[in-house]
Every structure is written in C-alpha cells, then in structure tokens.
C-alpha cells in the first residue's frame, strides 16, 4: 500500500512537471543613461572646473527621509560622463487599466558644485520616472526633470536622457 501511494505521488509530480506553460517571459527595459551638460560642458566630469563634484540621489517615496538611490557613473564612446540607473527607487502605482499598469518613482538629485576653495553650492533637482507594465513588457515610459518632460520612450531605442542646465 505504501508503494502504491509513493508511486502515485511520483506519477503526479512527473505529470505536473511535463505540463506546457504558455505564458511568455516579461521583457524588462528599465536601464537609464542620464547626461547633464551646460553650454556644451560635461557637468558630470569632476575634472572640469565648474562641473559637479558630487551627485547624490534620494528616493522621495522611500521608507525614511534619507533613502539613497544607487546609480553608477560611466563614460560613453565619446568619453562623456553619464549616470546609469538600473533600479532602486520605490515605485508607486498611479494608474491601472486592464492588463496595463503605470508606476512612478520620484527622486531628488543633489548636485554639489565647488564655487571656490571654501564654498560649495548644492542644487536640488527633481526627477520623476514613469514605468509601464504589461504582461509582456516592463519599461521606462516617460521622465520629467524639474517638471519638464525630458524623455518619452521610443520602442527599440535606448533610454537616454539629456539634461541641459
């Protein structure tokens, strides 16, 4: 009797593992490359006078007032500096219709610039990121920087945001 029960369990799991899964895998497109320049000057190059010496990101929707958001700085083929953001800020659902959902992340950017040997200036900017999620695709859809639309997704194109100060 024990053998029959064991055999039934093995057959059940064998049949369960052979089932056909018709669900497709959701594609994710959320990597952002953010460039900041002023009058043609790469503001993220710390070696250029007048550029930002430090940049910090803080998640407005984070659990605490101080919720840092991680990002990487990198250089492109033209040796321009940019900030690469993968994920990390909390996403809040703002709209849902059928199988499509819209999420929003709100991030403060603190941009420190050296004025002279003893004085730094810290600017505070706001970036709002909208994501669209469907069963097949999760992607960045729009980005506002200081309440100005700076990016709208074009299918097949990289998520590059260019900020001019």
Predicted regions and their residues:
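Glycine-rich, aromatic-bearing surface loops/beta-hairpins
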Residues: 117-165
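Positively charged n-region of N-terminal signal peptides that target proteins for export
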Residues: 1-4
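C-terminal motif of bacterial Sec signal peptides marking the signal peptidase cleavage site
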Residues: 14-17
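A short, Gly/Thr-enriched small/hydrophobic beta-strand-prone motif that recurs across taxa
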Residues: 24-38
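Tryptophan-paired
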Residues: 52-116
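Short coil-to-beta strand junction motifs in C2/discoidin
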Residues: 28, 46-55
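Short amphipathic, basic-aromatic surface patches that mediate peripheral association
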Residues: 35-50
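Bacterial signal peptide processing site
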Residues: 19-22
């Amino acid at each position: 009797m024990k053998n029959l029960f064991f055999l039934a369990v093995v057959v059940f799991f064998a049949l369960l593992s052979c089932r056909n899964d018709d669900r497709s895998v959701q594609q994710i497109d959320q990597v952002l490359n953010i460039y900041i320049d002023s009058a043609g000057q790469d503001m993220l190059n710390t070696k250029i006078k007048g550029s930002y010496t430090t940049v910090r990101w803080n998640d407005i929707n984070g659990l605490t007032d101080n919720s840092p958001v991680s990002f990487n700085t990198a250089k492109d083929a033209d040796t321009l500096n940019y900030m690469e953001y993968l994920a990390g800020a909390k996403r809040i659902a703002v709209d849902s219709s059928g199988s499509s959902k819209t999420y929003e992340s709100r991030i403060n950017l603190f941009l420190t610039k050296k004025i002279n040997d003893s004085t730094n200036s810290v600017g505070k900017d706001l970036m709002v990121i909208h994501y669209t999620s469907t069963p097949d695709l999760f992607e960045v859809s729009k980005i506002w920087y200081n309440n100005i639309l700076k990016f709208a997704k074009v299918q097949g194109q990289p998520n590059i945001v260019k900020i001019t100060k």
